[in-house]
Regions:
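Flavin (FAD/FMN) cofactor-binding and adjacent substrate-gating region
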Residues: 56-89, 254-264
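N-terminal beta-loop-helix "entrance" segment that forms/cooperates
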Residues: 46-54
Length: 468
C-alpha cells in the first residue's frame, strides 16, 4: 500500500519574491509552523528573461523583502550589499533605483538561506481539498515529477499570468513572447539570424517601462536589427512619481482601498494608473528620445516608434509574424508588416472579469467548487489575502500571495513596495488559522503601522469623512 505523504502546516506554491518574503517572516517571527515551498524552476530566480544592462527596478531599495516589516533583518538589501563587499561602491553609484541584475542576485541570496524548505524542479499540476476525519480538512498537491504533498494551509504565489493582447494571444508561435521571455527569445533569433535573407526585424508592443528598456537594449545589443516600438498612445508617457500619489504604497492605503466600494476602487485605479502602468521613468524616456534623434542625424531608421497605433490583425506567414496596424496619427493603415520576433511588454493579468483579467488562476481550478465567488464569478478575497470559502465548507487557509491588486490596490501589482508587510499579514493570519501549531508562538510586530491617512493630515473633525 502506497504511503500517504506527511501532513505539514503550510505549503507554499512558488518561491519567488512573495513567498521568499513569507519564509523570512515566518522564520523571524519564530514561527512553529512547518512550511515547505514548491518551485518549478531548478533554482530561485527573479525575472531571468529581463536581466539585461540598462534595466532597473522601480521601487526604493529599502522596500525590499524584509525592511518595511523588520528594519533589523539580516535579509535586507543593505545587508546583502554589505556581505557581498559592495556596500560603499553601491552607495557611490548615485542610482535612484538598483540595477535589476543586482536585485535579482539579492532575491536569490535571500532564497539561499531557505534551501532546506524548498523543493526545486517541482511544477504543481493539481491542488485539491481533502476531507479527512482523522487529520481534519487539508489540501493535497501533486507535482509533475510524481511527488505529492499534504498541508493544512496553502499559500499560492506563482506570479501573475502574462497578458498578451488580441490578436497576438491567438498565435501559437515562439516568435510572439511576453517580456518575461525576452532574453531567451532574443537568443533563439540570434542563432537563426545567419539563415535570414533580410535584417532581423523586431516589434516591441506596449508603452511600459519594460517596453522602453527593451527598445534601448535592442538598439545597443543588435545594431543590425530593425526595431519598431508600437504604442497606442501619442507618446511614451512619463510615470507619475509625485510623492502624493506615491502614498498608494503606504501600508494604510491597502486598508483604505480594500474597504472602498467597487465604484470607488475603479475610480482610484483609473486615477492611479500612471503610477505603475503604461508609463516609464524620465531617464529611459530621455535616452530613447536621444537615440531616435541620433539616428535621424545619421540618416538611419533602424529604430522606429509607431505612435497612436492599434493592432488590427496578426498572422503567421512565410515563417514570420505579420501585423496589420492602424496608424491613427497618420490616418492610415500599415498592412502586412512582417517581423521575426514580437515582444509584448503589455503587463499581467489581475483577478477580475474584464478581457485583460482572469476570474481564477489556473492553479486554483481544482478547488474552485469550494471557493466563494462574487456576482461576476471572481474570487472573493479577505483582507488577510485568504480566499473565502462557500458557506458550509470547512477548510484550512488558502491564501493568494501577490495576486490581489483588484482587492488590495497598487501595492499588490507585482511591486516589491509592500511585499514585506503583506508577508507579515499572511504569516499572522496563518498563525490564527492554524492555532494548534501556533499556540506557543507569540511573535511581536517589528513595525507598528499607523492609520491612513494620518490624522494630522486631516482637518479637525474630518476623520469620519475619509471612509470610502
Amino acid at each position: 500500500m502506497r504511503m500517504r505523504p506527511p501532513l505539514i502546516d503550510v505549503l507554499g506554491i512558488g518561491f519567488g519574491p512573495a513567498n521568499i518574503a513569507l519564509a523570512a517572516a515566518l522564520e523571524e517571527g519564530a514561527s512553529p509552523l512547518q512550511a515547505v515551498f514548491l518551485e518549478a524552476r531548478p533554482s530561485a530566480q527573479w525575472q531571468p528573461g529581463m536581466l539585461f544592462p540598462g534595466s532597473d527596478i522601480q521601487n526604493h531599495p529599502l522596500r525590499d523583502l524584509v525592511t518595511p516589516r523588520n528594519p533589523r533583518s539580516r535579509y535586507s538589501f543593505t545587508n546583502f550589499l554589505f556581505e557581498q563587499g559592495r556596500l560603499f561602491e553601491h552607495l557611490n553609484l548615485g542610482l535612484p533605483y538598483p540595477m535589476r541584475l543586482e536585485y535579482a542576485q539579492y532575491v536569490s541570496w535571500v532564497a539561499s538561506h531557505f534551501e532546506a524548505q524548498v523543493r526545486y524542479g517541482c511544477r504543481v499540476d493539481s491542488l485539491r481539498a481533502v476531507e479527512d476525519r482523522a487529520n481534519g480538512p487539508h489540501y493535497e498537491v501533486r507535482c509533475g515529477n510524481g511527488n505529492a504533498y499534504r498541508a493544512r494551509g496553502v499559500v499560492v504565489a506563482p506570479g501573475r499570468t502574462p497578458y498578451l493582447p488580441p490578436p497576438l494571444d491567438g498565435l501559437d508561435t515562439a516568435q510572439v513572447v511576453h517580456l518575461t521571455d525576452y532574453l531567451p527569445a532574443l537568443a533563439r533569433l540570434r542563432l537563426q539570424a545567419g539563415r535570414l535573407n533580410h535584417p532581423p526585424r523586431i516589434a516591441v508592443v506596449g508603452g511600459s517601462q519594460s517596453a522602453v528598456e527593451i527598445l534601448l537594449h535592442l538598439a545597443d545589443a543588435w545594431p543590425q536589427a530593425e526595431v519598431v516600438g508600437i504604442s497606442r498612445r501619442f507618446g511614451y508617457r512619463l510615470k507619475d512619481t509625485s510623492p502624493f500619489t506615491g502614498e498608494v504604497y503606504f501600508p494604510g492605503f491597502v486598508d483604505l482601498f480594500y474597504g472602498a466600494s467597487r465604484e470607488r476602487k475603479d475610480q482610484l485605479r483609473r486615477d492611479l494608473h500612471p503610477t505603475n502602468y503604461a508609463s516609464a521613468d524620465a531617464d529611459v524616456l530621455d535616452r530613447l528620445y536621444q537615440r531616435l534623434y541620433m539616428d535621424r542625424l545619421q540618416g538611419v531608421e533602424r529604430l522606429q516608434v509607431w505612435r497612436c497605433a492599434d493592432l488590427m490583425g496578426a498572422r503567421l506567414e512565410g515563417g514570420r509574424v505579420v501585423l496589420d496596424v492602424r496608424r491613427n496619427d497618420l490616418g492610415e493603415a500599415v498592412l502586412g508588416s512582417a517581423f521575426d520576433l514580437v515582444v509584448c511588454a503589455t503587463g499581467f493579468r489581475d483577478i477580475g472579469p474584464s478581457e485583460h483579467q482572469e476570474r481564477c488562476p489556473r492553479l486554483l481550478h481544482g478547488v474552485l467548487p469550494l471557493l466563494a465567488l462574487d456576482a461576476e464569478g471572481c474570487l472573493q478575497i479577505g483582507a488577510d489575502y485568504g480566499l473565502r470559502l462557500q458557506p458550509g465548507h470547512c477548510g484550512g487557509p488558502l491564501v493568494l500571495n501577490g495576486l490581489c491588486e483588484s482587492s488590495h490596490g497598487m501595492g499588490d501589482a507585482g511591486s516589491f513596495s509592500l511585499l514585506a508587510l503583506r508577508a507579515k499579514t499572511i504569516a499572522e493570519s496563518l498563525h490564527r488559522a492554524l492555532p494548534k501549531a501556533a499556540a506557543a508562538c507569540v511573535a511581536p510586530s517589528a513595525v507598528t503601522l499607523a492609520p491612513y491617512p494620518p490624522a494630522a493630515a486631516l482637518p479637525t473633525g474630518a476623520a469620519e469623512a475619509v471612509s470610502l
